[in-house]
């Protein structure tokens, strides 16, 4: 495989999709050496087949707002690869959503799901609709209109969506309800469902918890843990909230939290009481993080990211490309020893190079934030066997999965000098499972 040629061909065939190109380039650059050990892969044109999605659905969503005006948004579902299981990946509702972002997320999801060892392929979907500022009735009407098209492309053995940015328990509930009505069946077609209708315990917490479990495995390789460590967290949604919760539980101190308007810096640390306030502010009142600064009298920086503050550990948990090369250099200069990604591809390629050149611990999202989709897979299992596991059972399975992912990364990513390149390890481990499955299934 010539990685540069493959990437040039993709850019020619799919122009104006920078996020997708970035994701493919990052994977190709790390798997090329391992790929070239298998000439049968080239003969089967495997890399091109793996980079291009199986299919992409793009559709108009028309709905009525509370004033009786007709609104139009775009809806998408990218079914990337189902070599090892049904397509699996979230639905994102945000004004920034476009095909490039969803293709990148579906591509990444394929390898992330492979790493979990559970039978799940990769997919992603969403819309440029934003729930922010919309009434509950408007969100429901939009979701129902969205499902009028999506429902025909999904199913428990075909494609199992879940939540993502802008899609929480409320939106998943509306989607599941509409699917149930249209398909006339009650099946595990969605994950992240409410506990009352087939959801799994620990699912809301899973991405944040899983990230910290992975971080703990990394820290063990350096003979340390979270106790007394100062952590920077970006975001204030589901992933950030439960990341903070687990850091507090394990003895660390989180001093930042953010949203799209800016970030707060609380040198005393976000404790349990303050975290409860953030959860209430964000989940119930849909408020802004600056209100935290007003309530607790701490620093609020508008229009900025938290990465200039001093810390031991950085946990980017907001969105893609939120942490650039300059941010990375600031973190390294300030003594940061580890970066573990709760969001999908939050670090730019330049930032990743800075971390790796400095030889600090750096965990890419496809490994570190795989806890969310892992517990989604466990929810699928519970739905299929019509049983419900306890929180303790699910949490133990999550810990085991994250430990196994870490071991796979170390196996494939350890370099000659002993430094673990977790990006390479995650990409090669995830790729090899999918590649072998595709080879075994013929040219399809």
UniProtKB/Swiss-Prot annotation:
GO terms for cellular component: cytosol. One of its GO terms (molecular function) is glutamate dehydrogenase (NADP+) activity. Pfam families: ELFV_dehydrog, ELFV_dehydrog_N. Keywords: NAD, NADP, Oxidoreductase. Disulfide bonds: none annotated. This is Glutamate dehydrogenase. Its EC number is 1.4.1.3. One of its GO terms (biological process) is glutamate biosynthetic process. It is an enzyme of class 1 (oxidoreductase). It catalyses: L-glutamate + NAD(+) + H2O = 2-oxoglutarate + NH4(+) + NADH + H(+); L-glutamate + NADP(+) + H2O = 2-oxoglutarate + NH4(+) + NADPH + H(+). SUPFAM superfamilies: Aminoacid dehydrogenase-like, N-terminal domain (SSF53223), NAD(P)-binding Rossmann-fold domains (SSF51735). Belongs to the Glu/Leu/Phe/Val dehydrogenases family. The active site is at residue 124. InterPro entries: Aminoacid_DH-like_N_sf (IPR046346), Glu/Leu/Phe/Val/Trp_DH (IPR006095), Glu/Leu/Phe/Val/Trp_DH_C (IPR006096), Glu/Leu/Phe/Val/Trp_DH_dimer (IPR006097), Glu/Leu/Phe/Val_DH_AS (IPR033524), Glu_DH (IPR014362), Glu_Leu_Phe_Val_DH (IPR050724), NAD(P)-bd_dom_sf (IPR036291). PROSITE patterns: GLFV_DEHYDROGENASE (PS00074). Homohexamer.
């Amino acid at each position: 495989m010539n990685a540069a040629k493959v990437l040039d061909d993709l850019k020619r065939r799919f122009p104006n999709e920078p996020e997708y190109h970035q994701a493919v380039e990052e994977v190709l650059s790390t798997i090329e050496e391992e790929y070239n050990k298998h000439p049968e892969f080239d003969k089967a044109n495997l890399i091109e087949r793996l980079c291009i999605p199986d299919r992409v659905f793009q559709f108009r969503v028309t709905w009525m707002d509370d004033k009786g005006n007709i609104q139009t948004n775009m809806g998408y579902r990218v079914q990337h690869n189902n070599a090892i299981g049904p397509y699996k990946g979230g639905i994102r509702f945000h004004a920034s959503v476009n095909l490039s972002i969803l293709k990148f997320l579906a591509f990444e999801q394929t390898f992330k799901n492979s790493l979990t060892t559970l039978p799940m392929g990769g997919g992603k979907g969403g819309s440029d609709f934003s729930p922010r500022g919309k009434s509950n009735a408007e969100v429901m009407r939009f979701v129902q209109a969205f499902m009028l098209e999506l429902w025909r492309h999904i199913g428990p053995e075909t494609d199992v969506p879940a939540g993502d940015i802008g899609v929480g328990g409320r939106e998943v509930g509306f989607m599941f309800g509409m699917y149930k009505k249209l398909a006339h069946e009650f099946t595990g077609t969605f994950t992240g469902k409410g506990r009352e209708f087939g959801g799994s315990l620990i699912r809301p917490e899973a991405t944040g918890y899983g990230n910290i479990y992975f971080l703990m495995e990394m820290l063990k390789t350096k003979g340390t843990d979270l106790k007394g460590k100062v952590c920077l967290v970006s975001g204030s949604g589901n992933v950030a909230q439960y990341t903070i919760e687990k850091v507090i539980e394990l003895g660390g101190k989180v001093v930042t939290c953010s949203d799209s308007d800016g970030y707060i810096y609380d040198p005393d640390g976000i404790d349990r009481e303050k975290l409860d306030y953030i959860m209430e502010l964000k989940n119930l009142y849909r408020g802004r993080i600056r209100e935290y600064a007003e309530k607790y009298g701490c620093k609020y920086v508008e229009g900025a990211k938290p990465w200039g503050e001093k810390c031991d550990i950085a946990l980017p948990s907001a969105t893609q490309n939120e942490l650039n090369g300059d941010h990375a250099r600031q973190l390294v200069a300030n003594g940061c020893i580890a970066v573990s990604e709760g969001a999908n591809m939050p670090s730019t390629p330049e930032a990743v190079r800075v971390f790796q050149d400095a030889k600090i611990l750096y965990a890419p999202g496809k490994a570190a934030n795989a806890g969310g989709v892992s517990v989604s897979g466990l929810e699928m299992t519970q739905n299929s066997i019509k049983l419900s596991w306890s929180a303790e059972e699910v949490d133990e399975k999550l810990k085991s999965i994250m430990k196994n992912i870490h071991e796979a990364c170390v196996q494939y990513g350890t370099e000659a000098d002993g430094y673990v390149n977790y990006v390479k390890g995650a990409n090669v481990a995830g790729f090899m499972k999918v590649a072998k499955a595709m080879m075994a299934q013929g040219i399809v």
